[in-house]
Structure formats: C-alpha cells, structure tokens
C-alpha cells in the first residue's frame, strides 16, 4: 500500500487545485451577503462576536481594511463583528465598508428592534475616503455618507443620520444643496424631526460622484438656529462600465525587417468607473490576429501600457514574402486588472508592414530590339523591369538613364507611371544615310535609394539595338526660305532666281521636278526641270497680296520615287518702291459762311501709297486755268498739309476748286482733284477756322467739318 501513497496524494492535490481554480473562475469581488438582520439584544457585550462577514477581492484580500459606521464596533481580520464596549442602543442601521487595493464593497446591518439614538454620533461613517474633517465646536454632528451606486428598490432608504446634541425643542432639521433643492432635485431628503438622511432613487457615480449637501436646524418659522454644516455624500463605485476604445481607427506602421521588440503603436481604452479602484484598472491582450501567417503570434501587447510590439524575427517581417502586408488585431481591454469577472471592450488595430527599398529593379532581358523609320519621332520600344518592392512607393518606381550611345541627344527615355516600363523615344529624326544602326546602353534605378546592404547589379543595365529603316524622303530646298530683292514694276519675264533642292536619298539617284505651290497674285512661273523662277505679270508693291513690301510664294520639289516624295520651299520677294502712285487730297468737300469774317475754308491733307522719298513733302497748288484769280488762296502749312482760304466773301452757292498736288518722287507725280466748297447762310452760327491749328489740325476734325458742310446742301 505504501508505494501508492504518493499517487493518492498527487490525485488529492490536483483535485484541490482544480477546485481552487474553479472557485477563482466563479469569484465575484465584494461581500458575499450584502444585508444582514440582527435582533436588538438587551446589551451588546464587549468583544463578543455578533456575526461573521465574508468579503473577497478575488486576489487574496491583501491589505484588507474594515470600517464600521458606529464607533462602538469593529470588524476583526477574520470578518467577525464585535462591540468595543458594552452598549445598549446603536440605532436602527449599521454599515460596514471593506476595501483592498483591488475591490471595495459595503454591507448593511439592520438592527431589528433598534431605536433611534439620541446622542453624539461624531464618528458616523468614519471610513470616508478622505481624511475626516476636524471636529469643530458645534452641536450638529455630521459625517460623510457612503452609498453604493446602482442600488435597487425599495426606495427611499435610510443612509445616515444627523444628530444635534443641543437641539432645542420643536426645532427641525433642514437639508439643502445639489440633489435636494437644486438640480437634480429630490435625490436626498432628511427627516426634519429625527435627522435621518435617506436616498430616493438609484445613484450613478459616473454622473455625480460626490454630493455636497448642507444641514442646518431651524425653528418652527424656518429661521436658522445653527448651521449650515457641510454633509458630503460619496457614491461608491460599482463595476458597471465596460472599457471603450474612443480614438479609432487605430492604424500602425512598422518597417519590414524591423528588429524584434520594435514598438508599432499604442492602444488606449477608457473606463468610466472610479480610476482609484480596480473597476477602471485595465489590462490588454490580443484576442485574434488576421492573417495568422507566417506566425500566429506576430505581435505582443503590453498588458498594462497597451504598447504593441513585434515578437518575430526580422526575417519573418519580409513584406515581399508575406501573403498580405496588412495585419488586423482584435485588441481586448478588460477591467478588474484582467480578472475573469472584469468587463471587456474590443477594438481593431490595423498594422501595415511598410516597404523598404531592399530589392533593386532588374531588366527582364539583357538586350532589346527596336526599329524606326528615318525621319520619324516618338516611342520606339518599351523596356520592361521587375521589382519586388511596393508598387505605391519610390522603392518600386523606376528611373531610366541612357549612359552610352546617344552623343547627338537623338534619344530620350521616360518612365511609364502605370507600368513602370521605360519608354525609349526618338526626339530628333534619324537619317538612314547617316547611320542605319544605333546601340544604346540603358541603366535603371529606383527613385528611392537602396538600403545599405543592397546594390545595383548587372541586371540593372540593358542594351538596346536600334535599326533605322530607309524611307523615300522628300527633296530639301536650300536655302529655305529663299530671299530676293527686286524693284516693283520690273518687266514681265524677268528672271528672279533659280531654286535648288536636293534629295536626301543620295543612294537612290532620283530626279527632281519643280512646280508652283502657292502664288497668291499669280505673278510667278518656275521651270520644272532647272528650277528657274521668272515673272508672268508686273510686280506691284502696293498690291493687297504684299505684306510690308514682301511677297511670299511656295514651290514644290518632287522626286521620282515610288511613291514620289515632295518637299516645299518658300520664296520671299522684297519689292523696292518706285514712284508709280500719284498723291491724293482729303477732304474733298468744305463749307464756309457767306458773311464769315474769317475767310479760311479748309485745311487739306495729302497722302501717297508709295514709300519715302516718293511721297512728301507735297506741293499744293490751285489750278489757275480753271478758276479766276484774286478769289482763292492756298498756303502751305507743313510737308503734308495746306490751308485753302478766300480772298473775299462769296454768294451762297457751290464752287468747284481744282487742287493740284505733286509728290517728291523722281520723276514726280501729280494729281488734280476738285475741292467742292459750299457757301452757306449761317445765320447766328459761323465756322471758326482759327480754332484749328495750322500744324495740329487732325484728320477726324477735317472729316467732321466735311460732314457739317453737307447740311448746307
């Protein structure tokens, strides 16, 4: 039998441990019984046990303290309630408050048959959380009242008592303050005769934790006799609030390859319960990790601080090998310091594994081929690369560079932002006859620098072979534009120049023919064989087809290819002016009053389509063969204007005065124009020719004067 004794002991010990564990799982902090009924004896005997109270904080009751609302009783460490001396009357109710660092609770002892005591209760509710207020010399005796929140019916229920040892007869107690006669009103009341304080409804510590009331005694007329004296009502916290995560969404980032123990983020929950108790003492844990690969425990959370840290090796934090670089953690916060009886709240923490540039881009091929027609520009080939880094970062985005084979800067390469490919383009047309083949060396790098232990290798460079295809190119005029200067009015058939166009396709030995492409005035002809350009009409500098003395024509050069190619050349003919336009005067109508004292008629201006020196100074004259002398006079004002005036008044009539104007060309050209002068009866009005300065008379004023003269017709 002896050999079996250790086995039996082990079995018994395991049963005890299992039972203890089960009890811990079912443990609820506080008094196991909240209300006790005690029959009032003839006398409570000193040190005699009255009843046993059972309190547990589910953590061993370390630093357990008991406090009784009556100074005549105490609770021993074993939970036994005893009297401190012989006493007969203790009132109708006692309260016992138990407290540890982890929990607290209050039990009510109802004295069946007890009577209200008349005497000093100076230490009622002595166990207030704050130090008792020093006793003052007064007859009203009050102590703080402690009331658990969330009490149930019945209400009202007595929670304390106020005593006035020197209270006059017929005096009354009066209670005031927030919770009595101030909002929220009617929570507390006092028996005006006995001083019993009662609560009328359930209290919520998270709404109001402490009520500051005042007690006073009054006479029958309501006049204050003593007081007011402060009365503090403290609401005892119950664990009735779950932890709440209020600051979401919670998103953290950690760089791939980070060392074990790297802090990612902090989770903080809030509990509305009393922070001085375990009701608001939180502990954190990770309930779930998604995905659960490569390890179901990629992260750890500090149970007290809420810091989330990595717990796997840096090799497992490789973004490129993870199925998903995003992890979601269900974080649970539990009050009561994490005991099973604690309330819980959860939140989701999203952790992103951020990329670092630990992979260099690599070309998918060492060599690429491209073809392009000579003369063409644009993209000729897309170079493809592979990069395992995050496509949304500069660790993936490629930057290409031509490092050899581009001395003429005929090529450029840019990155396609969608595909990350290198788009190689021709930006300067290539000539087959110059070079039919080109070889470029291209390198690729990332926008972001590589991490120190990674470098660009041979796969980060590639060769591009480009073949230039021969095409039938159009002939090219040289020079272009072609410029000649000739006098206008040269004789028809005059040779202006011989154009010259060459064929870039020098190896094909093609012939070239010429033709007129654009000749707005129809003045030119070109020999289709030798390119000689001559005139078919008189060249006129004043033609509307001439712009600023320059006439523009276009010619074609067409080769003999199949199909033929065409080139265009521009001819700019600068026409020199000759005096081929006579000047003209303005205005051609004037008026004057028949009784005018000022005999000035009009200021004449002259203009010429030719250029200087074939224009002004102009010479103004009256054609004397057509009009009598001693009636009209013309006087020069400046190079372009003259004043016409009368030598005597004329009768009302219309007069035609021939004006002869001559330019300064060699030979000069003359024009005779009739000036129509209207002599009017102006009544009280008159034309004031002096108002117009001889040198500053403007063309708009002359036109206005001409319009006014029409009124005399």
Curated annotation (Swiss-Prot):
Domain Cadherin as annotated: residue spans: 139-245, 246-363, 364-477, 478-585, 584-690
Locations listed in the record: Cell membrane; Cytoplasm
A molecular function (GO) term: calcium ion binding
SMART domains (UniProt xref): CA (SM00112), Cadherin_pro (SM01055)
Keywords recorded for this protein, A-Z: Calcium, Cell adhesion, Cell membrane, Cleavage on pair of basic residues, Cytoplasm, Glycoprotein, GPI-anchor, Lipoprotein, Membrane, Metal-binding, Repeat, Signal
Signal sequence coordinates: 1-22
Membrane topology annotation: Lipid-anchor; GPI-anchor
Task of the protein: Cadherins are calcium-dependent cell adhesion proteins. They preferentially interact with themselves in a homophilic manner in connecting cells; cadherins may thus contribute to the sorting of heterogeneous cell types. May act as a negative regulator of neural cell growth.
Subunit structure: By contrast to classical cadherins, homodimerization in trans is not mediated by cadherin EC1 domain strand-swapping, but instead through a homophilic adhesive interface which joins two elongated EC1-EC2 domains through a region near their Ca2+-binding sites to form a tetrahedral, X-like shape.
Entry comment, domain topic: Three calcium ions are usually bound at the interface of each cadherin domain and rigidify the connections, imparting a strong curvature to the full-length ectodomain.
Protein name as it appears in the record: Cadherin-13
Species per Swiss-Prot/TrEMBL record: Pongo abelii (Sumatran orangutan)
């Amino acid at each position: 039998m002896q050999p079996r004794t250790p086995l039996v002991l082990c079995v018994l010990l395991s049963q005890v441990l299992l039972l203890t564990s089960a009890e811990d799982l079912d443990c609820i902090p506080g008094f196991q019984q909240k209300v006790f009924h005690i029959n009032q004896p003839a006398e409570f005997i000193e040190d005699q046990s009255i009843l046993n109270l059972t309190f547990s904080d589910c953590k061993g009751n370390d630093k357990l303290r008991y406090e009784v609302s009556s100074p005549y009783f105490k609770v021993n460490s074993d939970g036994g309630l005893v009297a401190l001396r012989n006493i007969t009357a203790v009132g109708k109710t006692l309260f016992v408050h138990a407290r540890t660092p982890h929990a607290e609770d209050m039990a009510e002892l109802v004295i069946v048959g007890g009577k209200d005591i008349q005497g000093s209760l100076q230490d009622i509710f002595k166990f207030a959380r704050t130090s008792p207020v020093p006793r003052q010399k007064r007859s009203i005796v009050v102590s703080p009242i402690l009331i658990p929140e969330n009490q149930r019916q019945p209400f009202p229920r007595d929670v304390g008592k106020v005593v006035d040892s020197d209270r006059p007869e017929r005096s009354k107690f009066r209670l005031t303050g927030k919770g009595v006669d101030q909002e929220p009103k009617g929570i507390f009341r006092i028996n005006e005769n006995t001083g019993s304080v009662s609560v009328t409804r359930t209290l919520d510590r998270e709404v109001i934790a402490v009520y500051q009331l005042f007690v006073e005694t009054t006479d029958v007329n309501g006049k204050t006799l003593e007081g007011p004296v402060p009365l503090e009502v403290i609401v005892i916290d119950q664990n009735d609030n779950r932890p709440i995560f209020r600051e979401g969404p919670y998103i953290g980032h950690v760089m791939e390859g980070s060392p074990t123990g790297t802090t990612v983020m902090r989770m903080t929950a809030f509990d509305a319960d009393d922070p001085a108790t375990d009701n608001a003492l939180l502990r954190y844990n990770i309930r779930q990790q998604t995905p659960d690969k490569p390890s179901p425990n990629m992260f750890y959370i500090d149970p007290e601080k809420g810091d989330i840290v990595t717990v796997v090796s840096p090799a497992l934090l490789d973004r490129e090998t993870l199925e998903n670089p995003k992890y979601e953690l269900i974080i649970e916060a539990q009050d009561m310091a994490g005991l099973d009886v604690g309330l819980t709240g959860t939140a989701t923490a999203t952790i992103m594994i951020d990329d670092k540039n630990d992979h260099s881009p690599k070309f998918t091929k060492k060599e690429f081929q491209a073809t392009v027609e000579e003369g063409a520009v644009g993209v000729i080939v897309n170079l493809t690369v592979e990069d395992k880094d995050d496509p949304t970062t500069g660790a993936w985005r490629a930057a290409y560079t031509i490092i050899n084979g581009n001395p003429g800067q005929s090529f450029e390469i840019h990155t396609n932002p969608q595909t990350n490919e290198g788009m190689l383009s021709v930006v300067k047309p290539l000539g087959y006859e110059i070079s039919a083949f080109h070889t470029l060396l291209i390198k690729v790098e990332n926008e972001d620098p590589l991490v120190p232990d990674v470098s660009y290798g041979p796969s980060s460079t590639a060769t591009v072979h480009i073949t230039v295809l021969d095409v039938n190119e159009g002939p090219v005029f040289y020079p272009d534009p072609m410029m000649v200067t000739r006098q206008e009015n040269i004789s028809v058939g005059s040779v202006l120049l011989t154009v010259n166009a060459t064929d870039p396709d020098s190896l094909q030995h093609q012939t070239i023919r010429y033709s007129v492409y654009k000749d707005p005035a129809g003045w030119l002809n070109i020999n289709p064989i030798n390119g000689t350009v001559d005139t078919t009409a008189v060249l006129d500098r004043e033609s509307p087809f001439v712009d600023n003395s320059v006439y523009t024509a276009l010619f074609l050069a067409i080769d003999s290819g199949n199909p033929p190619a065409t080139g265009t050349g521009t001819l700019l003919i600068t026409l020199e002016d000759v005096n081929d336009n006579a000047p003209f005067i303005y205005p051609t109508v004037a008026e004057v009053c028949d009784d005018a004292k000022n005999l000035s008629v009009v200021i004449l201006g002259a203009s010429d389509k030719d250029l200087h020196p074939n224009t002004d100074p102009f010479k103004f004259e009256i054609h004397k063969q057509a009009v009598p002398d001693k009636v009209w006079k013309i006087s020069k004002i400046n190079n372009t204007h003259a004043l016409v005036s009368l030598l005597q008044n004329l009768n009302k009539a219309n007069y035609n005065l021939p004006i002869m104007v001559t330019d300064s060309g060699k030979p000069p050209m003359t024009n005779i124009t009739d000036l129509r002068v209207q002599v009017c009866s102006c009544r009280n009005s008159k034309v004031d020719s002096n108002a117009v300065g001889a040198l500053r008379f403007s063309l708009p004023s002359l036109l206005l004067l001409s319009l006014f003269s029409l009124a005399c017709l």
